[in-house]
Amino acid sequence: MVNIMDEIIVVTTPTIPGYKIIEVKGIARGGIVMATHLGRDILALLRNIKGGEVKEYTQMMAEAREEALRRMIEHAKKLGANAVVNFRFATSNVGGGMAEVYAYGTAVVVEREK
């Protein structure tokens, strides 16, 4: 099975060393809203009383970032891109124990410089 994240170049910079942007396809984006569940909330509450990292939420947000990134890559491929430049994550609290993670960047077609 091919890992979708291996099929496209994703960078936080406006250019990719060794590559030339030949076409801009538009904004690639992918988002997910994750809700906590009772088990995580109880563990988080106990950790909050004690202090320190809330590992249950850290794990949940890491999973959400991976899924948002995967969705952005799928969108970039649908746009006909083989790379995404200026990649970023954005997060927001939706309320009710939910958080949105949004991945976005500029979908482009690149070719190796000669």
UniProtKB/Swiss-Prot annotation:
Superkingdom of the organism of origin: Archaea
Write down the Pfam families for this protein, in alphabetical order.
Answer: YbjQ_1
| Residues spanning the signal sequence | none
Family stated for the protein in its record: Belongs to the UPF0145 family.
Record protein name field = UPF0145 protein PF1756
Q: Which organism is it from?
A: Pyrococcus furiosus (strain ATCC 43587 / DSM 3638 / JCM 8422 / Vc1)
